[in-house]
Amino acid sequence: MEGVVKMDNNYLVDIQHERLSFFTPAGEVKALNDVSIHLKEGEVLGIVGESGSGKSVTAYSLMGLTAYPGKLIGGELHFNGHEVEKMTEKDFSKMRGKEVSIIFQDPLTSLNPVYTIGNQIMEVIRLHTDADKKKAYARAVELLSLVGINEPEKRMKQYPHE
């Protein structure tokens, strides 16, 4: 990543004491207060919480997708040793989908009901890698298994509503 100093640590994701607020005409809304996450390569994290607890805001901030009027007001975010706040849009474009992704909790609103789950996952894999259909299929099955989806081969052929 151009112009971004790489930190020496063994974490792929290293969020330390993140504080993020949204500055609205009505005042400051504190969305995240002292969030810390440390993940090594190969680890999988599921963030679970009540609606409005900051799950999406945390993920978006790591991927450089915090929408205005959101602003990081404290803490440090590193991905693969790189300081997220100093990354460019070009850096994020290379990272998103290939190195880090979000799977939203409601597949009925996140996946297209016209296409199988497998086709949609494979499309993202092929978009961000040089994998052919066979390799993309194998990787998609592996990812479904990795996150605890039972019978991943069967799920690949199903539609989101099934």
Model-based region annotation:
Residues 1-162:
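ABC transporter nucleotide-binding domains
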